[in-house]
């Protein structure tokens, strides 16, 4: 749309402008770096099982408010999914800066290395109990990880305060205690 007024979109805007492709077929990247033991890395998750690889680039048509959620719920009702968790190690701080998360790290300098397989079983992904638990109880914060996976860079330092304020406000508004699961069994069915 910005092209219609004679403006060429920058890398950030191009990254935000998404096709209406199925979410489960996408490869997700951390963008910001994390500590990876004694190394620095960016993390990604790529479709691995045939069923989610088949969704890569699959246009889902017109997207309404609940379209993507409904597609994910429908998928997991009968099927699981596998994703390859990968690390891209920093090999050159000049070409792979930690402080500027907008810089894409060149794969020719450091290809993504598989580090784990995420296996997600079939499930009722949006039951009323899970919706309340996910929306009202849980909080997301990249700083919840272990020290060996500490977030790095300026954007991550800003996020620590922003996420803390956001979760505090949300828990107060929802009148929910702030708890973090320590076991998969804490997540309702």
What annotation goes with each model-predicted range?
Residues 1-189:
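Active-site-adjacent core segments of small-molecule enzymes
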């Amino acid at each position: 749309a910005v092209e219609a007024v004679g403006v060429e979109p920058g890398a950030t805007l191009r990254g935000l402008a998404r096709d209406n492709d199925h979410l489960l077929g996408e490869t997700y990247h951390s963008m910001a770096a994390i500590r990876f033991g004694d190394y620095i890395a960016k993390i990604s998750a790529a479709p691995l099982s045939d069923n989610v690889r088949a969704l890569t680039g699959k246009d889902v048509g017109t997207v309404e408010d609940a379209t993507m959620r409904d597609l994910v719920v429908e998928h997991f009702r009968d099927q699981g999914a596998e994703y390859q968790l990968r690390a891209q190690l920093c090999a050159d701080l000049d070409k792979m800066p930690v402080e500027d998360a907008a810089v894409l790290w060149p794969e020719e300098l450091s290809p993504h290395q598989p580090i784990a397989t995420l296996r997600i079983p079939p499930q009722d992904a949006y039951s009323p109990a899970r919706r309340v638990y996910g929306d009202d109880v849980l909080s997301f914060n990249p700083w919840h990880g272990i020290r060996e996976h500490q977030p790095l860079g300026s954007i991550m330092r800003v996020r620590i305060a922003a996420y803390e304020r956001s979760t505090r406000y949300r828990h107060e508004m929802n009148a929910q205690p702030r708890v973090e699961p320590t076991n998969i069994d804490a997540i309702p069915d």
